[in-house]
From Swiss-Prot:
Subunit structure: Component of the PEX2-PEX10-PEX12 retrotranslocation channel, composed of PEX2, PEX10 and PEX12.
Pfam families (alphabetical): Pex2_Pex12, zf-C3HC4_2
Entry keywords, A to Z: Membrane, Metal-binding, Peroxisome, Peroxisome biogenesis, Protein transport, Transferase, Transmembrane, Transmembrane helix, Transport, Ubl conjugation pathway, Zinc, Zinc-finger
UniProt protein name: Peroxisome assembly protein 10
Listed pathway(s): Protein modification; protein ubiquitination
Family indicated by similarity: Belongs to the pex2/pex10/pex12 family.
Binding site for Zn(2+) 1: C402, C405, C422, C425
Catalytic activity: S-ubiquitinyl-[E2 ubiquitin-conjugating enzyme]-L-cysteine + [acceptor protein]-L-lysine = [E2 ubiquitin-conjugating enzyme]-L-cysteine + N(6)-ubiquitinyl-[acceptor protein]-L-lysine
Listed transmembrane segments: 24-53, 55-76, 133-165, 202-229, 277-296
Residues in compartment: Peroxisomal matrix: 1-23, 77-132, 230-276
Zinc finger residue ranges, RING-type: 402-440
Listed PANTHER family: PEROXISOME ASSEMBLY PROTEIN 10, PEROXISOME BIOGENESIS FACTOR 10
Length: 454
């Protein structure tokens, strides 16, 4: 009788992966490279838009152009299952951080369907799971599309919240006046303690509505967590459980023994024996704590929560902060690449990438420091459309119009090359692209000079 071959035993469970998790420096380097190529693609699309539709249309749709460029870049790479140029540059592959049971269960068909050639290297020894198509599409949606939609809807949401706060404050103010009249005192009487507290809280929310709804503090906290853990560089990657691994096997990296035993995905490591950014995380946390403490101390010492003048200041802050609240931060741009123009978007606002809008000075503070009266939002100090006598030394109807908005100049400002535009128009332009719209000469935000009449 022929002896039957013994039944094939199932492969042993995969207890460790030969592909270590990527270190924080490599993740940041890959992000910088991707940000650079996204900027190049956005510039090409913007130039094409300018040639087809003109400079005014290109300027008006600059934010949409950047969003479309970023989405197109990720759709041509991540959505199709390919690596981005930054990932290829740093030898990284994006994988799912699947539960350990998926690695241990070799009979699971769901796991087998996602394993790429029995492992990332095709060597038959298993490996982490590549992200599925729905997960890749969800990542692009939450990383690019949703932030852009939120930035477009944010001004309307702020306006609605501001109207409700102002209405409630007016009601409380009238109630306090009525109570004070009945009690013979103008301070609101003893029974208005709860109303006074509510009034102060609502006044604080109204005065600081823009920084409270900017999301900059949340982005800074996300970045601080990444500095400590080195896992998720973006919040959207944490939502979809996407991490990076090195395509180079653990035995080929610099500290091979250390990587093999301590830095596999199953052991939760992955820094490859390289130093992380924990020190930066500590500094960022200290910075946020100090700013929070200074803000609380300022509110307690000045009593600005219950003070007046909040409405005028808030009206002026809208025009100043509305552009910087989500504009640059929408992309959660922590890239240090000098070619990523969106990383310089907050220069005029004075806020850093991790600090957020809380570090920006309000228009009231700037006016007090510069001894200059603050105008309400939408108003211009010098509007050449009101009269020909305003800056009459600018001759000619065409010379008195802005090339970007095609309207009469408002608060004219000149670049280093001598071209004159509206202050708001050229400020928005150089935040998106630091060059003159006419001659393409470099024009940084700190070099824009406002013109003043004699």
């Amino acid at each position: 009788m022929a002896t039957q071959p013994p039944p094939a035993r199932p492969p042993p469970p995969l207890t460790s992966s030969p592909y270590p998790y990527a270190a924080a420096p490599d993740i940041i380097r890959a992000h910088q490279k991707d940000a650079y190529f996204q900027g190049v693609l956005a510039n090409r699309l913007s130039d094409l838009h300018r040639r087809l539709r003109g400079a005014r249309s290109a300027h008006a749709w600059a934010a949409e152009t950047r969003t479309f460029a970023a989405a197109l870049y990720l759709c041509l790479t991540t959505l199709l299952g390919n690596r981005t140029l930054g990932e290829e540059y740093c030898d990284l592959v994006q994988v799912e951080e699947a539960p350990s049971k998926l690695f241990a269960s070799s009979s699971s068909k769901a796991a087998d369907d996602h394993i790429y050639e029995n492992g990332l290297g095709g060597g038959g020894d298993g490996g982490p799971l590549l992200p599925s198509l729905p997960r890749r599409a969800g990542y692009i949606l939450t990383a690019i599309v949703l932030p852009h939609l939120a930035s477009r809807a944010l001004p309307s949401v702020r306006s609605a919240i501001r109207k409700r706060l102002q209405s409630r404050l007016a009601t409380l103010s009238r109630r306090r006046q009525q109570t004070g009249t009945k009690s013979g005192s103008g301070r609101g009487g003893r029974g208005g303690g709860g109303g006074i507290t509510e009034y102060r809280v609502l006044r604080y929310l109204l005065t600081h509505l823009t920084p409270l709804t900017s999301g900059a503090h949340f982005r800074a906290a996300t970045l601080a967590v990444f500095y400590f853990t080195g896992a998720y560089y973006e919040l959207s990657k944490w939502v979809w459980g996407l991490r990076y691994v090195f395509t180079t096997r653990a035995g080929r990296v610099v500290d091979d023994d250390h990587n093999r035993h301590h830095h596999s995905p199953q052991h939760g490591g992955g820094n490859g024996g390289r130093a992380g950014y924990e020190v930066l995380g500590v500094l960022l946390v200290v910075q946020m704590a100090v700013r929070a403490w200074l803000h609380v101390r300022e509110q307690l010492s000045s009593g600005s929560v219950a003070g007046g003048g909040g409405e005028e200041e808030e009206d002026g802050e809208d025009g100043f902060r509305e552009r910087t609240a989500f504009g640059p931060g929408t992309n959660v741009d922590v890239s240090l690449d000098e070619h990523a123009f969106t990383s310089n978007n907050e220069l005029l606002g004075g806020g850093g990438g991790g600090g957020g809008s809380s570090s920006q000075r309000s228009l009231g503070e700037i006016g007090a420091m510069a001894h200059t009266p603050v105008l309400k939002a939408g108003r211009a100090r010098y509007d050449l459309g009101t009269s020909d006598k305003v800056m009459g030394w600018i001759k000619g109807a065409q010379q008195r119009k802005c090339t970007l908005c095609l309207e009469e100049l408002k608060d004219p400002a000149a670049t280093q090359c001598g071209h004159v535009f509206c202050w708001a128009c050229i400020g928005d332009w150089v935040r998106e692209k630091p060059e003159c719209p006419l001659c393409r000469r470099e024009a940084m935000v700190q070099h824009i000079l406002p013109l003043r009449a004699a």
